Design a protein with these regions (language model features):
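Beta1-alpha1 glycine-rich phosphate/pyrophosphate-binding loop at the start
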Residues: 1-70, 153-181
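FAD-binding core/adjacent interface of flavoenzyme oxidoreductases
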Residues: 1-3, 69-141, 226
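Conserved N-terminal glycine/acidic-rich loop preference
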Residues: 1-4, 11-13, 39-55, 100, ...
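Short glycine-rich anion-binding loops that position phosphate/pyrophosphate groups of nucleotides
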Residues: 12, 105-108, 231-232, 324
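Internal hydrophobic alpha-helix adjacent to the cofactor/substrate pocket in enzyme cavities
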Residues: 17, 285-312
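A Rossmann-like FAD-binding core segment of flavoenzymes
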Residues: 72-80, 95, 163-254, 307
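FAD-site-proximal beta/loop scaffold in flavoenzymes
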Residues: 116-139, 219-224, 228-289
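C-terminal auxiliary extensions adjacent to catalytic cores
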Residues: 323-386
Length: 386
């Protein structure tokens, strides 16, 4: 019996689970187990909406897996022993594996005071805590730490849903820094229209009960701090003896296997996946293809074949600016911005289409195998991947 254990039911983990279940359905020599702390799927792309009190759909993981032969185990992964090939759940239960898919994602990379005095969007529960606090606040100052895409979307959403609050978007970089001049200007004008104050070139070094401390000693009052500034992987992988990078992500070979433990595949935000243009950054855009590829590779190995090289190229950066506005920067496969972009209602329609819930896609995946045609492979930008 080949035991395949998949850790994490995010975008990448769910893709791996549904694809592997589809390819091994009916086989009595393969057991697929998916482990996740919650029985519901979290759409991380919509947590900025949950964090402002908006209702988003919830999806039941065991219900989706019903009839596939895959089993679901609810619990927190507390330890992995890559040499013994075991996973400990809630410090009580131990699962043995022959092949492991590590898809546990990342958490906020914080500074002192964040754990005690700031909110994050690490989970649905975290977003609900933020929503409750914003509702009770009524008036005051909200500092959104981090000028990346999550910070921009969160600041816009908070300002639109809670017009009585003063929203400050603060970070080292300029919002929309990865965009060309026109879409970047549109994004910044939208934030200004919503009343968001932007402070670029500022770095928070500490979060206090009612303020943030900046590099250089300045203190800024804050009734609420939302931390979106950077991510890192949990220390589980490094503690397991797997090779990791400086952010705790598992270093993989070109087929998505750990460079130190080839029976471990790493996908999604928790993996440092190299392409011809560098290491992929964590997004749903690349997570689902990586999950599918891992499933296909595992199935190939079960057939006595070698796994194939994973190639992926980016194609867009969609950013919501509240419910009625958005900007989409189309990109080259290496994530450099193209000249093409969308703004306003066309951008809203485009973003809602491409970031629509993946749940129907997972439903199709558990019935029909997908392939590399499912995503752009990057052309000349990834041909050198070996």
């Amino acid at each position: 019996m080949e035991n395949v254990v998949i850790l994490g039911a995010g975008y990448a983990g769910m893709a791996a689970a549904t694809q592997l279940a589809a390819r091994t359905k009916g086989r009595d020599d393969v057991r697929v187990t998916l482990v996740n702390p919650q029985a519901t799927f979290t759409e991380r792309l919509r947590l900025h909406m949950t964090g402002t009190g908006q209702q988003v759909a919830r999806f039941d993981i065991p219900e989706l897996l019903a009839g596939t032969g895959a089993r679901f185990v609810r619990g927190w992964v507390t330890a992995v022993d890559a040499d013994a090939k075991t996973v400990r759940i809630d410090d009580e239960r131990v699962l043995h594996y022959d092949t492991l898919v590590y898809a546990l994602g990342t958490v906020a990379d914080t500074v002192p005071g964040v754990d005690d005095h700031a909110y994050t969007l690490n989970s649905f529960q975290d977003a609900e805590l933020l929503a409750d606090r914003l509702t009770r606040l009524g008036s005051g100052t909200v500092v959104v730490a981090g000028t990346g895409l999550t910070g921009v979307e969160s600041a816009a959403e908070i300002a639109e849903q809670h017009p009585g609050l003063d929203v400050v978007l603060l970070g080292r970089g300029e919002p929309g820094a990865n965009m060309r001049e026109k879409p970047r200007a549109y994004l910044q004008a939208a934030l200004e229209r919503l009343g968001v104050t932007v402070r670029a070139g500022a770095e928070i070094v500490k979060v206090l009960p009612d303020a943030v401390e900046l590099a250089g000693g300045e203190t800024m009052h804050a009734d609420v701090v939302l931390w979106t500034s950077g991510t890192r992987a949990a220390p589980l992988a490094a503690a397991a003896g797997l090779a990791t990078d400086e952010r705790g992500r598992i270093v993989t070979d070109a087929t998505l296997r750990s460079v130190t433990h080839p029976d471990v595949y790493a996908v999604g935000d928790a993996a440092a996946i190299k392409q011809g243009y560098g290491v992929m950054h964590g997004t749903c855009q690349g997570g689902m293809p990586a999950g599918v590829h891992a499933a296909v590779s595992i199935f190939r190995v079960l057939q006595g074949k070698q796994p194939k090289v994973f190639r992926f190229g980016y194609y867009h950066t969609p950013v919501s600016l509240g419910r009625g506005d958005a900007v989409v920067q189309f990109t080259h496969p290496d994530d450099r911005p193209r000249r093409l972009f969308l703004t306003g209602r066309p951008a809203v329609r485009y973003k809602e289409t491409v970031t629509a819930s993946p749940w129907p896609t997972y439903g199709r995946m558990k019935k029909l195998p997908a392939s590399g045609a499912f995503w752009p492979r990057g052309g000349r930008f990834t041909r050198g991947v070996r």
